[in-house]
Amino acid sequence: MLRTKTPRPRGGKSRRATAAAGKEREREREREREGRSPSGELSLQLEHVSLFSFLADAPREGAAAARTPFTPFEELLEGSCDPDPTPPPPLPPLQPQATPMDADEVVEEKDSGILSQDFFCTPDYITPDAPQLGSGFDANKENIPCPNSPEKSVCRSKRYKRDCSPKGLGSNDIFDSQWIAPVQFEGLDDSEEEQLKESSSHKRGSYVSQSAVALRCRVMPPPCIRNPYLNTDHQIDDNVFGGRQCKSSGFSPSVDGDGLSRYRTDFHEIEQIGRGNFSVVFKVLKRIDGCLYAVKRSIRQLHNDRERRQAVKEVQALAALGCHENIVGYFTSWFENKQLFIQMELCDRCLSMDRNQPLKCGEALELLYQICKGLDFIHERGIAHLDVKPDNIYVRNGVYKLGDFGCATLIDRSLAIEDGDSRYMPPEMLNDKYEHLDKVDIFSLGAAIYELIRGTQLPDSGPQFTSLREGKIALLPGCPMQFQSLIKSMMDPDPVRRPSAKEVLRHPIFDKLHKAPAKK
């Protein structure tokens, strides 16, 4: 084909056309440098841009000026143009041929008209990463393979319940790590507590089975305390006690899960009914059974081991003795805030309240008989009270009961001995002679009855105090001589000559008092 040169237009319009054509050529060069082919975009450009408008103005402007050589793109356009000066009709828009295409090609053809997120450097959240359906998907349900039945496993696995999962954890967090409830390290030594905390902190990031948690973080129970008032050592294995000392960590505070104390939870405090040097007694109502009890609480906190052992002695003695009609009943005890609480039988009053009112001889005989039965009961079990006095003798429904076993010890002197009230102590106790501890209780009971009959408090020192230890006892007004001689024998300075509790019960003075009615 012969190439015809188009005359270059003159004037302002020709310069503007030349400038527009130059800009077009610059854009074509940039596309070529960027790797774009002009032939690929030719069909789209011809739909919107017509170059014949530039060629139509050329004959009306005059002779053509000297022009630059043709570019390959211009040569292509010149070759495709017809030499006829009449412009051809505009080309119709190109229609894509209906050729069979795959599904992937259809998707690419549709996406060609949509601006890609990659062009704007933004992530695509709409298009899925993986195909939703496999290429071999078949709508026929008969071709779907049936999965195999699960194999039976011998070991059982624990299933987690949704309602049991702790708040704040997702559904997948249960399988990543086991939630462990906070553990209270009560009953543990300081070294054991630190050891458990370190081991739990190392294992917190990994899964811990429930059995391992129970074994590792289990709160150790308090130690078993050997009761020295019981002769059952041959029936209990020594490994139960383990030789562990009675430490503060051994007595875990009796506090519920919600932080309430056992005393406030189980009992309603009514009033205070007694107070001593070491403890205070309250009249309480137990909430669960509606019965009245007496709760004895230590006044100050028991910090060291010696104080705790001394406080526990009363509990151990009461528990070892068991039930007797002339001994104050014992129910239970516990430690709370380093204080000892003892739940006991509630009595009407103690004899110290009647100290200002002299006791009649008949009442004194009944008192002597009943308390001697209680002393005989504890002496047969090898226990001495060592603190018999009116403050520790109680009355309930006309029955006299002996209480407060805080100074109780063993008659064989295998335990430490602590003196009671010095006003009722015999001379051998003041001289540290402990060969006849059971006779100490006999002297104290005689001195207590002597005080109650006279209606005056015994001295703790002075000439009268010495005279009583020497056996010089004044006459008791309104009492028979047989009764006065019995009281004098009970307060004999020599413990060997004093009668035992069993011998006092056999005294003839009680024959008339407790004589059985004759059978008809």
Curated annotation (Swiss-Prot):
Protein name as annotated: Wee1-like protein kinase
Active site residues according to the UniProt entry: D387
E.C. no: 2.7.10.2
Compositional bias (Basic and acidic residues): 22-36
Similarity remark: Belongs to the protein kinase superfamily. Ser/Thr protein kinase family. WEE1 subfamily.
GO biological process: negative regulation of cell cycle G2/M phase transition
Binding site for Mg(2+): N392, D404
Residue positions binding ATP: I273, G274, R275, G276, N277, F278, S279, V280, V281, K296
Organism ancestry: Eukaryota, Viridiplantae, Streptophyta, Embryophyta, Tracheophyta
GO molecular function: ATP binding; metal ion binding; non-membrane spanning protein tyrosine kinase activity; protein tyrosine kinase activity
Bias kind Basic residues: ranges: 1-16
Biased composition (Pro residues): 84-95
Keyword Transferase among record annotations: yes
InterPro entries: CC_SR_Kinase, Kinase-like_dom_sf, Prot_kinase_dom, Protein_kinase_ATP_BS, Ser/Thr_kinase_AS
Reaction equation(s) it catalyzes: L-tyrosyl-[protein] + ATP = O-phospho-L-tyrosyl-[protein] + ADP + H(+)
Keywords associated with the record: ATP-binding, Kinase, Magnesium, Metal-binding, Nucleotide-binding, Phosphoprotein, Transferase, Tyrosine-protein kinase
A GO cellular component annotation in the UniProt record: cytoplasm
Ranges where the Protein kinase domain occurs: 267-510
Ranges for region Disordered: 1-43, 61-103
Organism: Oryza sativa subsp. japonica (Rice)
Pfam families according to UniProt: Pkinase
Enzyme class: transferase
